[in-house]
Amino acid sequence: MEMLEEHRCFEGWQQRWRHDSSTLNCPMTFSIFLPPPRDHTPPPVLYWLSGLTCNDENFTTKAGAQRVAAELGIVLVMPDTSPRGEQVANDDGYDLGQGAGFYLNATQPPWATHYRMYDYLRDELPALVQSQFNVSDRCAISGHSMGGHGALIMALKNPGKYTSVSAFAPIVNPCSVPWGIKAFSTYLGEDKNAWLEWDSCALMYASNAQDAIPTLIDQGDNDQFLADQLQPAVLAEAARQKAWPMTLRIQPGYDHSYYFIASFIEDHLRFHAQYLLK
């Protein structure tokens, strides 16, 4: 593992690391914020998954999360959004290929060789973080847009792994919207039954009551993708039918940008702290 950057930040450290991923068959970069140590108790971790076109640095530089994370004593881990490199399959579109991994395990050539972001986030990256940093095994997960989709499916597919989950403007029903249909048909093939295991709404309908965890979703009502790509009301209906403890907040005037995330990230960190720090 190689440190690329380190910066003092709110009495903690903002770092960027590169490591060779055996899951993705390429070098990967992640960012991590280490809050100032408090006592001898290892701090919990919040994983943040970013959206289309992003890498590990967007949240780090734009969301302004470090101040509150330092206050609460929460480690922030920001992975990249896809495998990277000249040998990694790519596409000219912004919504496919590098920068658009959709946090799933691809089954179709040429994508299946590298595009296993789900396995990377479930197994390899947490194991690496646990082995290299002084952190507890308590963790939560959050994300934006494609990353909100990623956070929700990670939580729904892994009962007991996360204390809580949150999302900003998530793609909740990828099986039914253009971004998801394009990605799933490319990465997973044309069998739409195979798509369902990567769809938050389908996973929530299939969930067990004892596996429900506290869930917070914020959505701006001035988001240009709200009607066509995001459709949070579909997940809210699934949550209602399953009595899943989910809060959906519609935020007037906010769009899809990091200005929206920066406005409400403190709420999300304090939401997760209620459960992470128990």
UniProtKB/Swiss-Prot annotation:
**Catalytic center at which residues?**
S145 (charge relay system), D223 (charge relay system), H256 (charge relay system)
Q: Which family does it belong to?
A: Belongs to the esterase D family.
SUPFAM superfamilies named among the record's database cross-references: alpha/beta-Hydrolases (SSF53474)
Q: Which GO terms describe its cellular component?
A: cytosol
Classification via InterPro entries: AB_hydrolase_fold (IPR029058), Esterase-like (IPR000801), S-formylglutathione_hydrol (IPR014186)
Name the Gene Ontology molecular function terms of this record. Answer: carboxylic ester hydrolase activity; S-formylglutathione hydrolase activity
Record's protein name: S-formylglutathione hydrolase YeiG
GO biological process, alphabetically ordered: formaldehyde catabolic process
Name the gene: yeiG
> Which reaction is the catalytic activity of this chain?
S-formylglutathione + H2O = formate + glutathione + H(+)
The UniProt entry, under Pfam families, shows: Esterase
For this protein, the record's PANTHER family field holds: S-FORMYLGLUTATHIONE HYDROLASE (PTHR10061), S-FORMYLGLUTATHIONE HYDROLASE YEIG (PTHR10061:SF1)
